A protein has these predicted regions:
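Recognition helices and adjacent regulatory flanks at domain boundaries
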Residues: 84-89, 169-177, 194-196, 201-205
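Acyl activation and transfer enzymes in specialized metabolism, enriched
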Residues: 31-49, 103-119, 180-215, 364, ...
Length: 401
């Protein structure tokens, strides 16, 4: 696989999925957005971030990226764009009222990969609107990792891997959305009582809520980790996610500490560089086999989806915790930002939860394909049972995006 092929392989899986996985960062500023200034900020950031403005082009059943000087206009309104857009891009910017929307096709980048670009656009906007003096560093991505090298290092990953797991039946109804906000301090206190990381406590509480909501004695959950450290690519702007899965037998009266300790032990085991690389080999090995097929994209999609389904990839829920969404972290920038939300399709699970932290509040943005009401209240009940203050638990209705 040459360098050009490696540069698209990191995200090629999102062309094999049944549905487009388009992501959205939703940022509420302290004042109404000035569209003209936002366009200037985008143009200034683009000059320092050419990676995001390459066009994916299909030729002879292969995909490659081409640089483009086509315009990228800021749009008014909250409607999500189709990707690629009319200029061939897979990233878009729009606004409405006080809210700025950053949309992108997951093929281009994961959340941490898009965050430096989003941060720089907001910094340049604040320079123009509020007279701040953010500089903005040129964003250059590390070279793409070589999946063939990783597979050669871990040949056993393709022998006893996901392809032998039992299939979990997921719900695939029209998604609905809900949003939960809770005090971060309360979650941290609960984690201290359990003697584990806050993310482990959060995941344990999600397991308890999902168990009650789905009325299941066993919950299968997935969580994502950033694998840039393991890949030796700290400045990668492309997808670098290693996803892990765990099956958890659970009773209604299971103490939080007991559940959280098990979650935490699993998490710690999987945070090592060796485990992340092995997992990359497992999850991308099937992608590589499909990629190597001399077939059309439509045939590759069918092959991939069948293999992924029987591999046991689907889960009851997945959770992704971005934490501070800005790269680099900037207390000065957040003075001008009131709220931050992350919305991603619940691909590969019945329920998908994206979690971010801002101003001492953790916001959970949930897309739910289970055709029954009550998940927001199930989450509220799980958090409040442990003394964590819930500031909001609201059902937002059908996902029309």
């Amino acid at each position: 696989m040459d360098a050009e092929q490696r540069s698209v392989f990191q995200g090629i899986v999102y062309y094999y999925r049944e549905n487009m996985v388009n992501c959205r960062y939703q940022v509420t500023l302290k004042d109404a957005v000035d569209g003209a200034l936002l366009q200037q900020a985008l143009d200034a950031a683009r000059a320092k971030a050419s990676y995001y403005f390459q066009k994916p082009v299909w030729e002879k059943k292969l995909l490659h990226l081409e640089p483009s000087d086509a315009p990228c206009p800021v749009r008014q309104g909250s409607a999500k764009p189709e990707f690629p857009d009319e200029n061939g891009f897979t990233v878009a910017l729009s606004y409405e009222g006080k809210v700025v929307y950053f949309d992108w096709f997951h093929f281009l980048a994961d959340g941490r990969g898009i965050a430096p670009f989003m941060t720089m656009v907001l910094q340049f906007y604040c320079n123009l609107r509020y007279g701040t003096a953010f500089e903005g560093q040129t964003l250059e991505t590390d070279p793409a990792y070589d999946i063939e090298d990783i597979l050669a290092k871990y040949p056993e990953s393709q022998v006893a891997n996901d392809m032998q797991r039992p299939v979990v039946q997921t719900f695939e109804e029209t998604p609905t959305c809900c949003r939960i906000r809770l005090e971060k301090a309360g979650l941290v206190d609960a984690a201290l009582r359990c003697g584990v990381k806050p993310f482990s406590t959060l995941t344990a509480l999600l397991c308890k809520a999902v168990r009650a909501y789905l009325d299941k004695d066993e919950v299968l959950y997935s969580y994502s980790t950033d694998a840039r450290d393991a890949l030796g690519a700290p400045n990668a702007l492309y997808n670098c996610v290693a996803s892990f899965q765990r099956k958890l037998p659970l009773t209604a009266d299971a103490p939080l500490a007991e559940v959280a300790v098990g979650v935490d032990a699993d998490l710690k085991e999987n945070l090592s560089a060796e485990r992340k690389l092995f997992r990359i080999a497992e999850q991308m090995g099937w992608v590589y086999r499909v990629y190597q097929q001399k077939a059309s994209l439509s045939i590759k999609k069918r092959i991939f989806q069948m293999g992924e389904y029987i591999s046991g990839f689907p889960a009851d829920f997945w959770v992704s915790y971005l934490g501070d969404p800005f790269r680099p972290s900037s207390p000065e920038l957040t003075r001008y930002i009131e709220d931050f939300q992350t919305w991603v399709p619940a691909d590969g699970a019945s329920i998908g939860l994206e979690c971010t932290s801002l101003h001492g509040i953790i916001t959970l943005c949930v897309k739910n394909k289970v055709p029954r009401p009550g998940f927001a209240e199930a989450l509220r009940a799980a958090f409040e049972a442990e003394g964590i203050r819930v500031l909001e638990a609201v059902e937002l209705g059908e996902d029309l995006t």
